[in-house]
Amino acid sequence: MPNLNWSKLNHMQIGRYAEYYAKMEFTSYGYDVYTSEVDDHGVDFVAKSPQGVFLEVQVKAVRDNYVFIRKDKITLDDAHLVCYMRFSDGALPEVYLIPASVWNTPNAVFVSRDYEKPGQKSKPEWGIAVYGAQRSSFRFRTAAFR
């Protein structure tokens, strides 16, 4: 049984745990998982489905309400997935699979931030903003593995 006191882990530890957990989830559904030693293109691993379909996966761990991916690190299509994992103390992580194509039509949950105003220095990003009531209607779950 894993330690479920996630708040005791730092940002790097929770991210590393999330990546391993995601790989185990994919493997448990019969996917082959391929990991690169260097994460310089925004892909944490590649998963090959039992039907032979290859998916590029970016894992994002969150303890609060917002997480983002730099726009230059992901392609907006169905072959690129975000494995969004929400960590709350006392429970196993909630796992959601989100096709990157959702950002082709941004909304209140799947946001686009370009930071083009004077003085803004952040690079453009795609965000996932899940607050309050939105959480219960968040429709992407691990059923997408099947």
Q: Across the structure, where does each feature detected by a protein language model lie?
A:
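Mixed-charge (Asp/Glu-Lys/Arg
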Residues: 1-41, 46-146
